[in-house]
C-alpha cells in the first residue's frame, strides 16, 4: 500500500487550514491512505490554559467533516484528518476514518489526556470512551493512536493485539522536546509489537512552541524507513503490510509468548 502523511504548518485561520489540508489530499491522490498532524485545522490552542476555544470546535456532521469525506471520495483514498471534534455535547481530540466511498466509518479519540505546562489538554478534551480502535482496509488493518497516547505502551500493544498491521500517530511534537528519544520510543514499540508505525507531526512556530516535524515511518523490525526534516511537505511511502504479519508470526513472534495472567 502507499501511505501519505501531510507534515504541515497551521495558521490562525480554520478556513486556510482546511484549504491547505484539502490541497494535500489532491497532492496525495494515488495513495491509499493519507493522514495529518494533531488538530490540523487550528493553532495548537492547548499550549494555553483555560481559554475559550468554542470557535475551534468542529461539530460531527458539519460542512468541514463533509468536505473531508467528499475529498476522500474524489481522490479515491482512505483519509484520517485529526481535529477538535464536538460530538453529542462533548469535545475530543479525534481522528476520523473516512473511506474512498466518502463514508465516515469511525472516529478514534485520544484516550489519555495530558496536563502539563504548554499542554493544558484536560482544559479542552474529553477522554475517549471507546479505547483504541483499528480499521480494516483491503490492504491491511490500521490502528490510530493520538499523540500523547503513544507514551503509554498499552496503546500500540492494544492495536497490535487487535490485528493492526500499521499504527498511525497524529502528533504535535516541539523542538524543545526530546525528539531523538521520541524516535527510539517509536522504533522500540514497532519492534516489540512487530508492526509498522507512522507518526505525522506539525511544523512551524506558534507563539511559544516551535514544532519539530521529523515525521517518521518505522518498519516492524524497528528500522527507520523514512524520517523527515522540519519543513512542510507531503511524505509518500510504499509499504508492504504483509511484512508485519510475517514478522509477528515467524521472524519475531513475541506476542505469542505473552502471559497476560502474570501482568497487572
Give short role names for the model-derived ranges:
Residues 57-78, 151-234:
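CN hydrolase (nitrilase-like) catalytic-core segments centered on the catalytic cysteine
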Residues 16-25, 152-157:
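Short, acidic/polar
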Residues 14, 22-100, 173-188, 192-195:
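Cys-nucleophile CN-hydrolase/nitrilase-fold catalytic domain and related Cys-dependent amidase chemistry
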Residues 81-83, 94-97, 133, 215-217, ...:
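Short beta-strand scaffold segments in enzyme catalytic cores
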Residues 1-12, 94, 140-149, 168:
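Active-site-proximal beta-strand elements of phosphoester/diester hydrolases
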Residues 86-162, 175-184, 249-253:
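Active-site catalytic loop in hydrolytic enzyme cores
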Residues 244-264:
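A conserved C-terminal secondary-structure "cap"
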Residues 7-9, 37, 109, 201:
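Residue-level recognition of beta-strand->loop/alpha-helix junctions
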Amino acid at each position: 500500500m502507499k501511505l501519505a502523511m501531510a507534515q504541515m504548518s497551521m495558521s490562525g485561520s480554520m478556513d486556510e487550514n482546511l484549504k491547505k489540508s484539502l490541497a494535500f489530499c489532491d497532492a496525495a491522490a494515488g495513495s491509499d491512505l493519507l493522514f495529518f498532524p494533531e488538530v490540523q485545522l487550528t493553532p495548537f490552542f492547548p499550549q494555553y490554559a483555560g481559554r475559550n476555544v468554542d470557535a475551534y470546535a468542529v461539530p460531527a456532521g458539519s460542512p468541514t467533516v463533509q468536505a473531508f469525506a467528499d475529498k476522500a471520495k474524489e481522490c479515491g483514498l482512505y483519509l484520517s484528518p485529526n481535529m477538535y471534534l464536538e460530538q453529542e455535547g462533548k469535545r475530543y481530540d479525534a481522528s476520523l476514518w473516512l473511506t474512498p466511498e466518502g463514508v465516515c466509518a469511525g472516529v478514534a479519540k485520544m484516550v489519555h489526556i495530558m496536563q502539563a505546562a504548554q499542554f493544558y489538554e484536560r482544559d479542552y478534551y474529553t477522554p475517549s470512551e471507546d479505547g483504541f480502535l483499528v480499521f480494516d482496509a483491503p490492504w491491511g488493518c490500521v490502528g490510530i493512536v493520538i499523540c500523547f497516547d503513544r507514551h503509554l505502551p498499552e496503546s500500540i500493544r492494544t492495536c497490535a493485539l487487535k490485528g493492526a498491521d500499521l499504527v498511525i500517530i497524529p502528533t504535535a511534537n516541539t523542538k524543545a522536546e526530546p525528539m531523538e528519544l521520541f524516535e527510539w520510543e517509536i522504533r522500540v514499540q514497532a519492534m516489540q509489537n512487530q508492526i509498522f508505525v507512522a507518526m505525522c507531526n506539525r511544523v512551524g512556530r506558534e507563539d511559544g512552541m516551535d514544532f519539530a516535524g521529523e515525521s517518521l515511518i518505522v518498519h516492524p523490525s524497528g528500522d527507520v524507513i523514512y524520517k523527515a526534516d522540519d519543513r512542510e511537505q507531503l511524505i509518500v511511502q510504499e509499504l508492504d503490510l504483509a511484512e508485519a504479519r510475517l514478522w509477528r508470526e515467524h521472524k519475531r513472534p513475541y506476542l505469542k509468548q505473552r502471559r497476560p495472567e502474570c501482568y497487572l
